[in-house]
């Protein structure tokens, strides 16, 4: 976009410690604290009644010291790779969109998500894994998932496994995970960790672009992970003078991104770019908090796509918008609507995997989903089937922990440095 989406917005300012503390307590007040066991990535024996999802992981996280955690929220000097297999309990004990976290260890594969394989591998083994799985896939497609703010490593692994399973996606799953501390007060650290990871994600995308076995690449990002996805694509486009044709779909779920900066990022990618699908909800309270942190500049995931200047700019750039404001979700922050709506997971996921467009009237969702890009229906594409299960671990009441750290951080003087 040559013109910024929000012309009248004030320039964003870096979040200060008091603002971050205020934002964090907003999350805490909206969501209660519920614990769960740590070390859930310790492998267990498979159960024949459970489904399995295999994925390749690339991460800039440091190795964890505790068994069963694998990777921490600290930053590594170079990317690391891993092969993961996740067991998912039968649909009779879990509804689509849910991550069934174990209440105790070891997990029971009949009722819980469980880890069957968690092995760190070198780059050569990772490339071999990818090549083998792409050759086995029906269409040679790869899906890269980038999680959002406040995610531990296991959050990202289990959520991505849920997305792949519930959507019925045929793409080869590749998880790109960055050093999030999984703390509500680590917003600034997490944001800088996405910047820290840009080069690693770009290298992943460059490899997929060069690999002749990979026929199609789709990217699904959630919340703060959208910043990392957009920056990596922008960086790649500038370096390569455009993006490859095999990069078909980029799906931005509840993006915690400044609307002005998004306009600049899209413009920098040039005219040859993937199809972008934007999932917004105007009642997203998590993004409302983020907006206050960033100087009251609108966040991309909370815009009204029918209002100017968004409507005109989105239409001019062929960006599909799916407005989920009317979807009733189970979470207080309305930031988890994809994960909380099993009907959308099943219905839209199956349609997209079958090659139908997201705005196809045959979906029959009536007024519950408004797909609008200046009234035009734009094609989303075949490999976008997993969009419907966009992750939401940022506010998952069953995944929050380490509140002693939160209290200690709030108790520090506002001028303290580390």
Give a label for each model feature.
Residues 17-25:
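Sec-dependent N-terminal signal peptides
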Residues 221, 225, 229:
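Gly/Ala-rich beta-loop-alpha elbow adjacent to hydrolase catalytic centers
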Residues 152-155:
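Short substrate-entry loop that stabilizes the transition state in hydrolases
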């Amino acid at each position: 976009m040559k013109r910024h989406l929000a012309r009248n917005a004030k320039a964003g300012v870096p979040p200060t410690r008091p603002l971050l503390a205020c934002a964090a307590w907003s999350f805490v007040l909206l969501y209660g604290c519920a614990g769960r066991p740590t070390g859930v990535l310790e492998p267990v024996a498979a159960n024949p009644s459970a489904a399995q999802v295999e994925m390749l992981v690339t991460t800039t996280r440091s190795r964890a010291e505790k068994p069963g955690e694998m990777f921490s929220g600290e930053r590594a000097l170079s990317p690391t790779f891993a092969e993961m297999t996740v067991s998912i309990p039968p649909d009779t004990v879990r509804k689509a969109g849910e991550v069934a976290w174990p209440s105790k260890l070891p997990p029971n594969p009949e009722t819980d998500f469980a880890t069957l394989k968690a092995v760190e591998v070198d780059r050569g083994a990772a490339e071999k894994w990818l090549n083998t799985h792409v050759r086995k896939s029906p269409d040679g497609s790869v899906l890269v998932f980038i999680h959002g703010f406040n995610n531990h490593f296991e959050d990202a692994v289990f959520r991505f496994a849920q997305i792949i399973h519930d959507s019925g996606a045929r793409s080869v799953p590749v998880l790109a995970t960055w050093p999030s501390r999984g703390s509500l007060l680590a917003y600034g650290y997490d944001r800088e960790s996405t910047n820290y990871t840009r080069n690693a994600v770009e290298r992943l995308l460059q490899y997929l672009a060069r690999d002749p076995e990979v026929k199609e690449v789709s990217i699904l990002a959630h919340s703060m992970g959208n910043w990392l996805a957009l920056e990596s694509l922008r960086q790649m486009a500038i370096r390569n003078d455009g993006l490859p044709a095999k990069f078909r779909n980029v799906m931005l779920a509840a993006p915690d991104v400044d609307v002005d900066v998004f306009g600049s990022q899209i413009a920098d990618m040039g005219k040859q770019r993937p199809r972008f699908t934007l999932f917004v909800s105007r009642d997203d309270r998590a993004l409302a908090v983020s907006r206050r942190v960033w100087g009251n500049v609108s966040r991309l995931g909370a815009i009204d796509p029918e209002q100017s200047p968004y409507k005109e700019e989105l239409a001019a750039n062929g960006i599909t918008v799916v407005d989920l404001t009317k979807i009733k979700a189970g979470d207080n922050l309305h930031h988890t609507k994809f994960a909380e709506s099993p009907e959308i997971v099943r219905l839209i996921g199956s349609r997209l995997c079958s090659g139908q467009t997201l705005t196809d009237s045959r979906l029959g969702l009536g007024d519950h989903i408004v797909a609008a890009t200046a009234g035009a229906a734009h094609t989303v594409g075949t490999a976008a089937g997993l969009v419907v299960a966009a992750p939401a671990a940022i506010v998952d009441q069953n995944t929050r922990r380490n509140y002693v750290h939160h209290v200690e951080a709030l108790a520090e003087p506002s001028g303290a440095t580390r």
